[in-house]
Amino acid sequence: MLTITSYFGFLLAALTITSALFIGLSKIRLI
């Protein structure tokens, strides 16, 4: 149970970081 929770937490964090970087690059490219 703990392993699954940690896995999903890591996956969510990775997804958040990826989208944040993508949005940042998009804004820079937009400017």
Curated annotation (Swiss-Prot):
One of its GO terms (molecular function) is electron transporter, transferring electrons within cytochrome b6/f complex of photosystem II activity. It is found in: Plastid, Chloroplast thylakoid membrane. GO terms for biological process: photosynthesis. Keywords: Chloroplast, Electron transport, Membrane, Photosynthesis, Plastid, Thylakoid, Transmembrane, Transmembrane helix, Transport. It is a single-pass membrane protein. Disruption phenotype: Cells have no visible phenotype or growth retardation effect under light intensities ranging from 4 to 400 umol quanta/m2/s. InterPro entries: Cyt_b6/f_cplx_su6. The chain crosses the membrane at residues 4-24. GO terms for cellular component: chloroplast thylakoid membrane; cytochrome b6f complex. The 4 large subunits of the cytochrome b6-f complex are cytochrome b6, subunit IV (17 kDa polypeptide, PetD), cytochrome f and the Rieske protein, while the 4 small subunits are PetG, PetL, PetM and PetN. The complex functions as a dimer. Component of the cytochrome b6-f complex, which mediates electron transfer between photosystem II (PSII) and photosystem I (PSI), cyclic electron flow around PSI, and state transitions. PetL is important for photoautotrophic growth as well as for electron transfer efficiency and stability of the cytochrome b6-f complex. Seems not to be required for photosynthesis. Belongs to the PetL family. PANTHER family: CYTOCHROME B6-F COMPLEX SUBUNIT 6. This is Cytochrome b6-f complex subunit 6. It comes from Nicotiana tabacum.
